Amino acid sequence: MDRKRIAAALLAAALLASCGRTAPDDRGQPEVAQPVPEAAPPPAPRPAVERIVRSAPVATSAPPPVARDGPAAPSSSANYALVRVFYGTNRSPLSVPGPEGRFGTLPGPLSYGEVVVSVPKVHQLGVIERPGMITGLFFSPDPRKHFTLREIRGLSRAQLLQAVAAQAERAGGPGQRLALVFVHGFNVGFDDAAFRTAQMSYDIGFKGAPLFYSWPSHQNVLSYLADGQRIDQSRPLIKRFLSEVIVGSRADRVIIVAHSMGTRGTVAALAELSQEHPEQTARIAALILAAPDIQARNFRDRIAPRLRRMAVATTLYASSEDVALQASYQVNGAYALGDTRAGISRFEGMDSIDATRAGTSFLGHSAYGESPALLRDIGSIVAGTPPARRPWLRRGADGAWVLEVVR
């Protein structure tokens, strides 16, 4: 245990600028993600993402929305777009919502709702523009320049599923109703998960209903071991939420994106669900494991066989330069599935992609959402394009795919 605690401290030092942190813009100057010359057009245009109109809110008997980061009545604007994102969480709500959000870091019962995120028209692909700070003082967010959480509204389970089904129907139509569920990783807060889901959906032009599940991470780089316990404890509720979305959303295709430590609860939940209700997991069109912090041996022995039986198109994004996964090795004494330093893991039914060359930003643990090359590839998976038809991928000597970045 002493070795693990020392390694966890090393992990904290390695993650000071990673793991779900949004990008500050230093008072209006956003960090610009370098565009990648496109080898093919993106899978869908940005206008496909649903915008919110204040005159037509989702009907609910839940408490009124809590406005944060901006005026109480957001409306259509030439300076920003509004994106509706749905959520499930087992975070305990705060008695008095404050600057840190409506939900804290303690576990609670499963609850549901929707958030409205503003995306500035000056948004750079892959970046979550947020205010900077100087000498400990945070600057107020400006929706013309920053992502802001405009509304958060609690919904009942029935209201959530009705709203998700309606949005998927409007965006895709019969036979093309899509739902995308994001499960965040270590050291990520509720608001950051909402921003990442909105940003990813906006950047890939997702036509459907985007959702996220937020488990009660401690939101502290020193709490790696404690976060591992939290994600394990959250597995039953993650399974319940995924099951409810798969069935209740009436989506024709469900795409699940899990990142980092969040992959532990996600794949364990799906493995159980595949045994209990195989008809549900049959509706999952794609499972994306981004930098998964799961021991590779455990995945091989316990998870991969069940995923094969599910016949779900699974994609692994891995790297040899992910600092967090390198530190995870020191904590756990075993290579993570997303760590390619001992070779990339390959399994039947899973497309393994070495994303080390996605750029130096991949050293940041949340780069799966920040790299334009990775976003383009994720968008192609959502669109159903197989690896052989994605020209930025090539076969490596070990048979795995390599994500190339044209500079």
PLM features per residue range, with description:
Residues 45-168, 173-174, 194-253, 270-286, ...:
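Lipolytic serine-hydrolase domain surface
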Residues 19-23:
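Bacterial signal peptide processing site
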Residues 238, 258-262, 266, 271:
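Gly/Ala-rich beta-loop-alpha elbow adjacent to hydrolase catalytic centers
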Residues 181-185, 259, 291:
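The conserved beta1-alpha1 loop
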Residues 178:
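Alpha/beta-hydrolase fold active-site loops
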Residues 1-17:
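Sec-dependent bacterial lipoprotein signal peptides
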Residues 24-37:
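Short, low-complexity, disordered segments immediately C-terminal to signal peptides
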Residues 188-193:
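Short substrate-entry loop that stabilizes the transition state in hydrolases
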